[in-house]
Amino acid sequence: MKPPRHCPAVLIAAPASGQGKTTVTAALARLHRNQGRKVRVFKCGPDFLDPMILERASGAPVYQLDMWMVGEQESRRLLWEAAAEADLILIEGVMGLFDGTPSSADLARHFGVPVLGVIDGTAMAQTFGALALGLAKYQPDLPFAGVLANRVGTLRHAQLLEGSLTEGLRWYGALSRETGIELPSRHLGLVQASELNDLDLRLDAAADALASSCEVALPPAVEFAAPDLIAAEPLLKGVRIAVARDEAFAFTYGASLDLLRAMGAELQFFSPIRDTRLPEADSLYLPGGYPELHHVALAQNASMLAAIRAHHAAGKPLLAECGGMLYLLDSLTDVEGTRAELVGLLKGEAVMQKRLAALALQAVELPEGSLRGHTYHHSLTTTELTPIARGLSPNGGRGAEAVYREGRMTASYVHFYFPSNPVAVAALFAPGLETAIAGKPAPTGDCVSSGIAPPTVGAGLPAMGP
């Protein structure tokens, strides 16, 4: 067993979503980076958008930590490896500190990382202290560093908030309410980093605001135990995988792409919006993103639509997740009612909704093996296709996402986390496999019968069927 490693670390959490966790985490990352420190940032739970912002802020890749989807050992490995190179580790929580199972608090407690509570101080005075006390004392064994007030109006306002804290609660400072440092959002969350031309200006402004009003010394070092290291097998040696990546398709986990490379795959990125043909590839990966914002442009690229149809007709592997699946349908209609005809490999149509349609962790038993991931979308899909499998939410949700298969094409609303089962992922992308697996029926029963141990942790809202 390798020795443990030590690195200053803190987990940034809040009483609820929308309190400004990402803004504060990004500001801290940019501040310490500007001071010459190497900062590694992680995000609790499934998320694609926050990590884009945090990568720009820190200048380093951002990975997920999660006790169920990622797993304890993989989370331990990521932290242990980061501790070898970083001067500071920041972990942004998800939802409220104690929300969900697993929660941000579960992760902080398990790895001994102290929590910095971020509380939106808007229209609040003494109640701030009550909220801070609740965060600190609700679970007595939770390491708690202190609190930081966000969106504070004036210096006097900040003094009122600080004065409301009970003895023993540490005040880290206050971040003012400035539009120049807030991060804009849309229906799936924050606007993608690549779409914000002034993002670096916002991050530097937030870092400067923190430096002038908050305590920014490094937190105490945390001991991170060494994991059990398992080397990836070269199951995809020499396999060329074309990966869609542009403003319509950008929702990929860094750990998933790392795994494909570690198994020997060669990744070739392309744009379904701008490119007219696919790269020379054995397999195709269409991840999620915002196809609904670009569906007209996607529909107008007839050459790319034909290239994807030809890839499938040649019997080559194709994996499509969420937005990637919508792209493969006959049509996609946005919230304004504008309809665009797309690839047409999956018979059906999707319509965007103004409200959230599904949010949940998912465990899926495919013919290739069990995979874990999550679902999060604002569309509803109508199709007569028969699924080969349905996901199960680990907390026993009232619905589950379907997985569809036509030949070597696999499509679902589920965003799969590839390291949850490298062998199954390799089978999805490897060319030349027997196609008999495509016709296997969906398994029945609960997570135990599907080979996925019933976790003591689950998460999220129940998913709705497509």
What positions do the PLM features span?
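ATP-dependent carboxylate-amine ligase catalytic core
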Residues: K2-F111, I119-L142, L155-Q159
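Phosphate-binding active sites in nucleotide-utilizing proteins
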Residues: V239-A313
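Short, low-complexity intrinsically disordered segments enriched in A/P/G/S/L with frequent Arg
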Residues: P441-A442, A463
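Internal gly/pro-rich beta-alpha loop/helix module
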Residues: A125-E233
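Cysteine-nucleophile active-site neighborhood
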Residues: L267, P291-E365
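Amide-donor transfer/coupling interface in amidating biosynthetic enzymes
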Residues: E182-I230, P234-G238, E349-E434
